[in-house]
């Protein structure tokens, strides 16, 4: 199966991409998948891509459009879903209400 050049070029130009880079050796895949689900549910249709990227060495990072918005070591632990949603919202749609989270 091939993707037409139009579709491929449009998808590569899309912004609003999240990458959750997690330590597979530490068994953090489920935590990463849960956070991805939370982001996709909250920003339904607004996020174009959420990627889970396995790694090693205790890594847990969340990237938004190439910008590091959460790092486990720097931020002293894992993000709560609420905090991660607020950071994403504040960077992409500062005026967007998050309902009961705000």
Q: Which ranges hold each PLM region?
A:
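Domain-level signature for proteins that mediate thiol-based redox and metal-cofactor handling
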Residues: 1-102
